[in-house]
């Protein structure tokens, strides 16, 4: 189940808001220009389906989204136990960073938390299968798919060079709880 949990950035043990309905999540994030939406497809590709099959299943949504955002490319990313250098990759994702373009992800399978650091607040958005999130360029954030990830996601890019992070150097991610339950990190 999708979830948004909001904290003060200096009080990781104090929850200010905790909502689980997609409409409430979207409404809370909208003032920060963060898009949260749900997509459904006529078929749900298997987690190990070829990338082209996954892209084709969501093509109508992707075409609309890419037209709205001016994005130039989309691909499929898989993060699981067989991902090369998984510990190093996870460490990179767990460090607060920004991007020079919007970070757009659609969760085909599994779940992960985008944790956003905005104006003295931390917004932890647990995304699950069927969720779309678009984090605007320049918003400090980190991502956690859990210690045993099993995620398949569509990535949409304007810059065809792909995922490029600018790290903030802030260790804030170390002070906040993981939002992906260990027992559920591979489930949707």
From Swiss-Prot:
The keyword NADP does not apply. Ni(2+) binds at residues 97, 99, 103, 141. Binds 1 Fe(2+) cation per monomer. Binds 1 nickel ion per monomer. The record marks 105 as: Important to generate the dianion. Fe(2+) binds at residues 97, 99, 103, 141. PANTHER family: ACIREDUCTONE DIOXYGENASE. Catalyzes 2 different reactions between oxygen and the acireductone 1,2-dihydroxy-3-keto-5-methylthiopentene (DHK-MTPene) depending upon the metal bound in the active site. Fe-containing acireductone dioxygenase (Fe-ARD) produces formate and 2-keto-4-methylthiobutyrate (KMTB), the alpha-ketoacid precursor of methionine in the methionine recycle pathway. Ni-containing acireductone dioxygenase (Ni-ARD) produces methylthiopropionate, carbon monoxide and formate, and does not lie on the methionine recycle pathway. This is Acireductone dioxygenase. The lineage of its organism: Bacteria, Pseudomonadati, Pseudomonadota, Alphaproteobacteria, Acetobacterales.
């Amino acid at each position: 189940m999708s979830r948004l949990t909001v904290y003060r950035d200096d009080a990781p043990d104090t929850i200010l808001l905790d909502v689980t309905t997609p409409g409430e999540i979207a409404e809370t994030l909208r003032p920060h220009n963060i898009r949260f939406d749900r997509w459904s497809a006529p078929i749900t590709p298997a987690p190990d389906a070829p990338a082209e099959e996954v892209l084709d299943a969501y093509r109508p949504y992707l075409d609309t989204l890419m037209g709205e955002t001016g994005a130039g490319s989309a691909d499929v990313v898989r993060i699981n136990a067989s991902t090369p250098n998984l510990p190093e990759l996870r460490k990179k994702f767990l460090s607060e960073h920004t991007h020079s373009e919007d970070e757009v992800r659609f969760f085909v399978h599994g779940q992960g938390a985008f944790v956003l650091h905005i104006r003295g607040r931390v917004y932890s958005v647990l995304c699950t299968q069927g969720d779309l999130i678009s984090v605007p360029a320049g918003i400090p954030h980190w991502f956690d798919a859990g210690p045993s990830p099993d995620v398949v996601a569509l990535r949409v890019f304007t810059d065809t060079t792909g995922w490029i992070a600018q790290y903030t150097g802030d260790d804030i991610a170390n002070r906040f709880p993981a939002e992906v339950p260990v027992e559920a990190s591979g489930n949707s």
